[in-house]
Amino acid sequence: MKKIILVAGGTGGHFFPAVALGEELIKRGYEVHFITDLRCKQYIKQDMKVIFHILDLKRSGNIFLFLPRLSIAVLKAIKLLYNMKSAVTVGFGGYPVIAPMFAAIFLRVPIIIHEQNSYLGKVNKFFASFAKKIAISYEKIKNLPEFAKSKIVVTGGVVRENIRELKVIEMSSRGLTTGSKKSLIKALDSVVKPRNDKLFTIFIFGGSQGAKLFSELISASIQIVMQKQPSLELNIIQQAALDDQVKIKDIYSKLNITYEFAEFFDNMALQYKEADLVISRAGASTIEELTYIGLPAIFIPLPSAADNHQYYNAKLLEDKNAGWCLEQNNISAEKLADKILDLISNPKILEAASQNLLKRRKEGHKLLSNLIEEVI
């Protein structure tokens, strides 16, 4: 049985797509090993079928501290990869992949890199010259060196299986009208619970890097929404830290809004199933999941994201009328409230965005697996 090594870490946005790819490769008969870091250890579940290895590399702004750490990590990675004797190593970008990728190059193991964002990250750009192939999620990608263009294969992003199992209801059957709607999506193998068709559900989450701003900004926006349209029947599903939940619950209760809170949603499919609109960051895995099921979103890109890649992700969708990009530095509760009200009042705009999302949907788990098999 041939072995394949996947390398991803740092955030859930890198981790979960790599796990989804691993599950597809296991179905094809490969033994899949996954090298990740301590930050992603929290996401590892017993039912995941890939074999995990923790190899941590702590970042430091001091080059004299970082280089010794990197050297030690590379030596550990060389030992690990040598014992595995893998056929290929696939890196998903970010600093946690640096040591294993250097080890693969040293051992002459073929490497493939996958860029999930619309902007080629620094680590992936560095390893582009060593890669056999460069898989990308977007048809157009910024920061790509000229020499690397011949290595490009558009595979799309890799979406988790439980998200792929969500079924998109045909546009003609959605029945979305102002004040009356149906669920946009439903689980293939589950019974959809009865619900109030007049209820408009917004799913709010800030990604694996936290949602402090969302707790403050969005609760203020919802207050404005309800002040402007008191008859609106609103349901909020929101990621929020425990210390923020008490305050937000008090606000929503006074507004007679139904709500559900969690610090972290383990099964996003359940929340996607209920939502009519999403408000979120613009990480690559979030965008790919929403694209796959055609669920429209207002994106508030994380301004501190490396190379501002979240802004480029969201702007690309906005330019294709497949979403809305509101920059954190320019946003206000009033602006966000106006956008929410505009979309609730104009369901055809939501339908059009959903259709445009579905136009760029790809079976990334299959296409990337096919590419790996070509390299092997």
Curated annotation (Swiss-Prot):
<feature type="binding site">
    <location>
        <position position="310"/>
    </location>
    <ligand>
        <name>UDP-N-acetyl-alpha-D-glucosamine</name>
    </ligand>
</feature>
<dbReference type="InterPro" id="IPR006009">
    <property type="entry name" value="GlcNAc_MurG"/>
</dbReference>
<keyword id="KW-0133">Cell shape</keyword>
<feature type="binding site">
    <location>
        <position position="208"/>
    </location>
    <ligand>
        <name>UDP-N-acetyl-alpha-D-glucosamine</name>
    </ligand>
</feature>
<keyword id="KW-0132">Cell division</keyword>
<dbReference type="GO" id="GO:0030259">
    <property type="term" value="P:lipid glycosylation"/>
</dbReference>
<dbReference type="Pfam" id="PF04101">
    <property type="entry name" value="Glyco_tran_28_C"/>
</dbReference>
<dbReference type="GO" id="GO:0005886">
    <property type="term" value="C:plasma membrane"/>
</dbReference>
<comment type="pathway">
    <text>Cell wall biogenesis; peptidoglycan biosynthesis.</text>
</comment>
<dbReference type="InterPro" id="IPR022439">
    <property type="entry name" value="RPE4"/>
</dbReference>
<protein>
    <recommendedName>
        <fullName>UDP-N-acetylglucosamine--N-acetylmuramyl-(pentapeptide) pyrophosphoryl-undecaprenol N-acetylglucosamine transferase</fullName>
        <ecNumber>2.4.1.227</ecNumber>
    </recommendedName>
</protein>
<keyword id="KW-0808">Transferase</keyword>
<dbReference type="Pfam" id="PF03033">
    <property type="entry name" value="Glyco_transf_28"/>
</dbReference>
<dbReference type="GO" id="GO:0051991">
    <property type="term" value="F:UDP-N-acetyl-D-glucosamine:N-acetylmuramoyl-L-alanyl-D-glutamyl-meso-2,6-diaminopimelyl-D-alanyl-D-alanine-diphosphoundecaprenol 4-beta-N-acetylglucosaminlytransferase activity"/>
</dbReference>
<feature type="binding site">
    <location>
        <position position="160"/>
    </location>
    <ligand>
        <name>UDP-N-acetyl-alpha-D-glucosamine</name>
    </ligand>
</feature>
<dbReference type="GO" id="GO:0008360">
    <property type="term" value="P:regulation of cell shape"/>
</dbReference>
<keyword id="KW-0472">Membrane</keyword>
<keyword id="KW-0328">Glycosyltransferase</keyword>
<keyword id="KW-0997">Cell inner membrane</keyword>
<keyword id="KW-0961">Cell wall biogenesis/degradation</keyword>
<dbReference type="InterPro" id="IPR004276">
    <property type="entry name" value="GlycoTrans_28_N"/>
</dbReference>
<feature type="binding site">
    <location>
        <begin position="11"/>
        <end position="13"/>
    </location>
    <ligand>
        <name>UDP-N-acetyl-alpha-D-glucosamine</name>
    </ligand>
</feature>
<keyword id="KW-0131">Cell cycle</keyword>
<comment type="similarity">
    <text>Belongs to the glycosyltransferase 28 family. MurG subfamily.</text>
</comment>
<dbReference type="GO" id="GO:0051301">
    <property type="term" value="P:cell division"/>
</dbReference>
<dbReference type="GO" id="GO:0005975">
    <property type="term" value="P:carbohydrate metabolic process"/>
</dbReference>
<keyword id="KW-1003">Cell membrane</keyword>
<feature type="binding site">
    <location>
        <position position="117"/>
    </location>
    <ligand>
        <name>UDP-N-acetyl-alpha-D-glucosamine</name>
    </ligand>
</feature>
<dbReference type="InterPro" id="IPR007235">
    <property type="entry name" value="Glyco_trans_28_C"/>
</dbReference>
<comment type="function">
    <text>Cell wall formation. Catalyzes the transfer of a GlcNAc subunit on undecaprenyl-pyrophosphoryl-MurNAc-pentapeptide (lipid intermediate I) to form undecaprenyl-pyrophosphoryl-MurNAc-(pentapeptide)GlcNAc (lipid intermediate II).</text>
</comment>
<dbReference type="GO" id="GO:0071555">
    <property type="term" value="P:cell wall organization"/>
</dbReference>
<dbReference type="GO" id="GO:0050511">
    <property type="term" value="F:undecaprenyldiphospho-muramoylpentapeptide beta-N-acetylglucosaminyltransferase activity"/>
</dbReference>
<keyword id="KW-0573">Peptidoglycan synthesis</keyword>
<dbReference type="GO" id="GO:0009252">
    <property type="term" value="P:peptidoglycan biosynthetic process"/>
</dbReference>
